[in-house]
Amino acid sequence: RVLLTVALCVAASASFAQKKVVNEAQSIAKGSNADFGEARTLIKGALENPETKDDAKTWYVAGFIEDQQFNAERAKQILGQQPNEPVMYEALYGILPYFQKAYELDQLPNEKGKVKPKYTKDIKSILSANHVYLFNGGAYYFDKQEYKKAYDFFNQYVEISELPMFAGTQTAEKDSTFMTVQFYAAAAASLAKDSRLAIAALERAKNTPYRQYDVYQYLCYEYGEARTAQDSVMLEKTFEEGMQVFPDSAFFLNNLINTYI
């Protein structure tokens, strides 16, 4: 019994120590003297530790650290100073994976069988506030011709819009900005020379009105480049769809005829 009591005390002490590490990481990431490297090191350990890796707060703090660094760099921009743009955008991009896991854990029932989310409100608020900056990040890497990174940012914008947590909110609206981002995600994937990625992005974008003619043309090109038997079938199908959607264009009919010559 004594040994059991000692073991329980040690376990409780270890659990408390790890939760203290999570709080410390969050504290270090706050304020003008934030040390994001140290905060990340601490939270990385907590994300791997059995005592804290299944706590919503651990994952929330990991995303919070990324958000704090993003905001620290963006504050420089607001003040007319030059931010470290790669650092700023990489921190921005890093928020979502942590918050998705935190959100998932935050919806689980507590020890009394009740669901009482603690971090969901903040998660939704931060993701919504930062949403448009993913467009900026995609444009930044697109201009630098880092097309795969550009795709990642544009695609994360679309991904957030489609998260169930934002259903019925402004963040989920398929407005002109959404359609523009969706198009540039496809364009970036194509320019990155990744046909599979480009095809998926173009298929997603083809049913929205933004630059729909261009999307169909790019889709035909990508199916032609992919060159598998299934891609050849899809190429013909896309030519046929293009003829129906754009009956005044000779492009799709002429190219369909060429496939049979």
Regions found by a protein language model. Name each.
Residues A56-T58, F166-Q170, V181, D214-Y216, ...:
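TPR alpha-solenoid repeat register
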Residues E51-K53, Q107, E162, Y210-R211, ...:
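Short coil turns that delineate tetratricopeptide repeat
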Residues Q18-I78, P83-V87:
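Start-of-domain marker
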Residues I28, E66, Y141, Q182, ...:
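Residue at a conserved register position within TPR or TPR-like alpha-solenoid repeats
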Residues R1-S27, G242:
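Bacterial Sec-dependent N-terminal signal peptides
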Residues E24, E38, A62, Q69, ...:
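Structural register within alpha-helical repeat arrays
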Residues I65-Q182, R196, A229-S232:
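Short coil/linker segments at helix-helix boundaries
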Residues A46, A102, Y157, R204-A205, ...:
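Canonical positions in the second alpha-helix
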